[in-house]
Amino acid sequence: MIIGVGIDVVDVARFKRQVERTPLLLERLFGDGERNLPAESLAARFAAKEAVAKSLGAPVGLVWRDVVVEREDGHRPEIAVRGSAKKIADEAGVAVFHLSLSHDAGIATAMVVAESR
């Protein structure tokens, strides 16, 4: 059963400027394994984190670093939740997040479906 759907878009150039202006933003938003990615990938991952939050009803207390986009070579990206995000997802009955990412023409897009088993 679908618990929630979230969609977000991020202007890559604007996101890059924000990160350049506020370097600590990377630490607040991304885990160690995410921070060294190119701006397009970071923007798409931030859109994914926003989409996860929306799929959960925009809960208070969600820590951005607790939502991680993981991708192994040759596989599609997946959402992993830890800490605050895991607690919120568990309380909502979410068993799996389905993720679609794209970036084109300077815009990064993410769609997330939160599903129970």
Swiss-Prot record:
The keyword Cytoplasm applies. Keywords: Cytoplasm, Fatty acid biosynthesis, Fatty acid metabolism, Lipid biosynthesis, Lipid metabolism, Magnesium, Metal-binding, Transferase. One of its GO terms (cellular component) is cytoplasm. One of its GO terms (biological process) is fatty acid biosynthetic process. Its main location: cytoplasm. Pfam families: ACPS (PF01648). One of its GO terms (molecular function) is holo-[acyl-carrier-protein] synthase activity. The keyword Transmembrane helix does not apply. Transfers the 4'-phosphopantetheine moiety from coenzyme A to a Ser of acyl-carrier-protein. Belongs to the P-Pant transferase superfamily. AcpS family. This is Holo-[acyl-carrier-protein] synthase. It comes from Kineococcus radiotolerans (strain ATCC BAA-149 / DSM 14245 / SRS30216).
